């Protein structure tokens, strides 16, 4: 029972609560992952087969977010509130640092993996806002990352299967021979950078709004964090659209002129993911209302 585990400072000394909180925190941020515990994720994604890529992006990372909410926030509400400004700055550092690493990658899988890690930084920022807007945005962001980056890895697997490479410099102009793949990839890329009416727009907006509305004592730090987060979205648009341009829209290389477009099965899978991305982008409340009542209870405890 989570309620019976709630750490009470009258029973447990503060130093003990902080020690246990930090141990849980490190365990879960390795799973998410956050900088500086993130190196395992891009390395595994760059070497793993397509099913493993999709499983990691779609499920494993979210178990870490669940742990942060279920244990660090609910079992240690007072300590989480104490650490909130630090966690918000940590989330911003994660967004910037992972985004910078994504820019310099030559392989598509590593680039997308670092972009995924960068996007998960918005989850930490949202949780640290200590208000319903930020929290709801963080949970929505976690779900959106699972869908969007799973779709990314499906696209990559389709390209890799045909070209036997994932190096950006070795690819080019595939949109001319794989038009279905290009259009579906465009929807996924637009969602990843936060284009309105696609799945990742609403959670990013909610997280940044939650940061601006936050009542944390370090108001200046919070406002700066929100502005940096907004700038990071612009930067992410640059490297994600560079990937799209280089792989699908540049000059078609001679060796790729005979490759085939997506099969009906591949088209069906990617179309289903894109429909989910569009639907929850247009109707975000259809997913937020599922957990909104629970989020209000969690935030009420933190604001006591």
Region roles according to the model:
Residues 176-180, 240-304:
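Cytoplasmic/organellar membrane-interface segments at the starts of transmembrane helices
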Residues 1-205, 209-241:
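Hydrophobic transmembrane alpha-helices and their helix-loop junctions in integral membrane proteins
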């Amino acid at each position: 029972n989570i309620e019976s585990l709630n750490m009470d400072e009258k029973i447990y000394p503060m130093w003990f609560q902080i020690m246990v909180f930090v141990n849980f925190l490190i365990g879960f941020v390795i799973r998410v992952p956050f900088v500086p515990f993130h190196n395992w994720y891009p390395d595994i994604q760059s070497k793993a087969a397509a099913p493993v890529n999709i499983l990691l992006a779609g499920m494993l990372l979210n178990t870490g977010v669940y742990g942060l909410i279920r244990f660090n926030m609910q079992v240690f509400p007072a300590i989480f509130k104490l650490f909130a400004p630090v966690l918000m700055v940590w989330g911003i550092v994660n967004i910037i640092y992972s985004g910078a690493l994504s820019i310099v990658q030559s392989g598509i899988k590593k680039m997308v993996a670092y972009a995924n890690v960068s996007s998960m930084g918005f989850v930490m920022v949202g949780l640290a806002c200590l208000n319903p807007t930020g929290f709801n945005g963080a949970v929505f962001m976690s779900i959106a990352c699972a869908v969007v980056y799973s779709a990314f890895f499906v696209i990559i697997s389709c390209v890799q299967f045909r070209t036997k490479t994932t190096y950006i410099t070795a690819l080019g102009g595939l949109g001319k021979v794989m038009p279905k793949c290009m259009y579906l990839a465009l929807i996924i890329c637009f969602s990843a950078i936060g284009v309105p009416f696609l799945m990742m727009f609403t959670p990013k907006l909610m997280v940044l709004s939650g940061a601006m509305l936050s009542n944390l004592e370090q108001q200046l730090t919070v406002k700066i964090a929100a502005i940096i987060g907004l700038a990071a979205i612009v930067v992410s648009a640059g490297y994600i659209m560079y990937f799209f341009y280089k792989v699908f829209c540049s000059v078609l290389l001679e060796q790729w002129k005979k490759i085939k477009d997506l099969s009906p099965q591949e088209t069906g899978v990617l179309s289903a993911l894109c429909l989910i991305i569009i639907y929850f982008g247009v109707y975000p409340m259809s997913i937020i209302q599922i957990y909104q009542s629970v989020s209000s209870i969690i935030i009420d405890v933190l604001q006591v």
